[in-house]
Amino acid sequence: MSFAGMLNRLHGQPESYDKKSKYKFGRTLGAGTYGVVREADGPSGKVAIKIILKKNVKGNEKMVYAELDMLQRLTHPHIVKFVDWFESRDKFYIVTQLATGGELFDRICDQGKFTEVDASQTIRQIMTAVDYLHDNDVVHRDLKPENLLYVTRDPDSDLVLADFGITKTLDIKEETLTTMAGSFGYAAPEVMEQKGHGKPVDMWSMGVITYTLLCGYSPFRSENLRDLLRECTAAPVPFHERYWKDVSQDAKDFILVLLVPEPEKRWTSKEALGHIWLSGKNATDHNLLPELEAYRRRARLRRVIEIVKLQNRIAKLKEHEEDPSESDMGDAQGASDNHKGDGSRLHALGLFAVREAKQKQESLQVEEELEKESRRRSFSNA
């Protein structure tokens, strides 16, 4: 045992804590209820390290060990790679591949052109990852554009599925999960109704992602749970002529077999991979970028609000650290640096920033209302 290791044992640190010295921590990439995600330099290059406060998962430590076990078993070109893990007296550290190529929609909007053919091949990549998970009885439960990342800035970079924080491994193939999980607007009806759910929830989310990728807006516009549930279960999926006239019928059919309210009637990942649209044969060469750019503008304004929330989460997490002098929680500066132009101005996160963020959120709501009204008029005239 090294001298440093002996000192760590004397200070009550677990044996694996020695690994921490291999990493130099950098900017904060995000924060949640249980901890933060930091960029770091390691022996094999840059990585992402998820830091979880043990105090925040007390009594639910098995949740962390389950995530670790699952990540170590998953090996797929379109799933973020597990690197290592270690722990301290008060924290767990999960080290994974760092995807630096940007989120799905940001990367697409930086291109000169993005067609329906490109969209079908993008969705195919993600669907192969979902199919791999389902073959291994794993349900992701939080599929959304923000969790779809490019590994590098290279034009031919792989797209990977990330964030397995609420993913569940089924004990038996047909096990039913009952906890609320997922993100508003992407969660399946059975999740919102708390009826019990399984693999079909991922297929619903894939339907929402595909729809948004093809037109730049969500198929469901409600802003509260009750209205959203009604919209998902009682109303037909809308394909507004103005935005969908240049999109193939195959693409619409693909979406419709995924956005089926009854989970038992929803297509599986295997069936979806066999759909003709994912072959790209009948997909059009219509450029989707104008609609997607509008989506990105709305997303950027939402990020301004998220940076304020991020700083508040980090502050709360720091309060729970046993040794604040050796904090690993970082700050929100790094996250704002990831989105220069829309978030970097808020690094101080003072009262002015909060006020500015609220004003931008209000402006966004006004813009969306005007957009909805414009669509209603155009739809009625279609």
Curated annotation (Swiss-Prot):
* Keyword ATP-binding belongs to the record: yes
Q: Where is the active site?
A: D142
GO terms assigned for molecular function? ATP binding; calcium/calmodulin-dependent protein kinase activity; calmodulin binding; protein serine kinase activity
What sequence ranges are listed for the domain Protein kinase?
Answer: 23-278
Q: Which reaction does it catalyse?
A: L-seryl-[protein] + ATP = O-phospho-L-seryl-[protein] + ADP + H(+); L-threonyl-[protein] + ATP = O-phospho-L-threonyl-[protein] + ADP + H(+)
* Recorded superkingdom: Eukaryota
The record, for PROSITE patterns, names: PROTEIN_KINASE_ATP, PROTEIN_KINASE_DOM, PROTEIN_KINASE_ST
Stretches for region Calmodulin-binding: 291-301
What's the family? Belongs to the protein kinase superfamily. CAMK Ser/Thr protein kinase family. CaMK subfamily.
Protein name as it appears in the record? Calcium/calmodulin-dependent protein kinase
Q: Which organism is it from?
A: Metarhizium anisopliae (Entomophthora anisopliae)
- Lineage, opening ranks: Eukaryota, Fungi, Dikarya, Ascomycota, Pezizomycotina
